[in-house]
Amino acid sequence: MDPCSVGVQLRTTHDCHKTFYTRHTGFKTLKELSSNDMLLLQLRTGMTLSGNNTICLHHVKIYIDRFEDLQKSCCDPFNIHKKLAKKNLHVIDLDDATFLSAKFGRQLVPGWKLCPKCTQIINGSVDVDSDDRQRRKPDSDGRTAKALRSLQFTNPGKQTEFAPEGGKREKRKLTKATSAASDRQIIPAKSKVYDSQGLLIFSGMDLCDCLDEDCLGCFYACPTCGSTKCGAECRCDRKWLYEQIEIEGGEIIHNKHAGKAYGLLSPCHPYDILQK
């Protein structure tokens, strides 16, 4: 079965028609979606599509029906977290996303989640009462109409060169060796651990770098491959993997699949990879 338009533009065609969240396979055209669902799809993917473009039933679940449930950590809009914050989260709704994006000048997506610390920062910075905030929320019909008018398809050119617009969600800042070494144990190797699509060679699993097997991507889009499952470095053809990570609260998450990779790995210091 051919991939859907959403999968093609996001370069996630390998995910099209998966039956992990739905038993059915097939397509919907975007004009079959409600105006609210079309708006959410646009904001959550950063894409522009026409009503004749298609979305497979798997991507409907991922970006519309179950998007909120699949957000497992704080979106960290202020880049303050050294570790993933996964406790006491609350969802950013459509009106809040619109209001806060305008207020802070950065894209906040409906369905993302905030931890108590980021919520306190927002509450401390947004010095308006509820009535004022309500008046400043855009008119729902007007916002939807404006967004739908922008759903015009633009050929992005060669699909392998597709990248989200620069003004969209920034890549999570996990590249500093000092912060990476403090909460992530790394196993390096001389040979590749991941294939050219970012899948583990020894198992074929599309494992997120947060090590949650059910996670469908919780990092900012990788500038190299576009995946939201790549942490500090793109997984495509990567020669190392995370053995464990530490999240806020001191909880350690171990990579259950690390043992299977030992046959591919050569002995060396766990942090040698950070000296590159």
UniProtKB/Swiss-Prot annotation:
GO cellular component: cytosol; focal adhesion; nucleolus; nucleoplasm; plasma membrane
Cross-link (Glycyl lysine isopeptide (Lys-Gly) (interchain with G-Cter in SUMO2)): K176
Modified residues (Phosphoserine): S182, S266
Keyword Phosphoprotein: yes
Superkingdom of the source species: Eukaryota
Chain spans, region Disordered: 158-177
Subcellular location: Cytoplasm
Subunit structure: Interacts with ARL14 and MYO1E.
Function: Through its interaction with ARL14 and MYO1E, may connect MHC class II-containing cytoplasmic vesicles to the actin network and hence controls the movement of these vesicles along the actin cytoskeleton in dendritic cells.
UniProt name for this protein: ARL14 effector protein
Source organism per UniProt: Mus musculus (Mouse)
Taxonomic placement: Eukaryota, Metazoa, Chordata, Craniata, Vertebrata
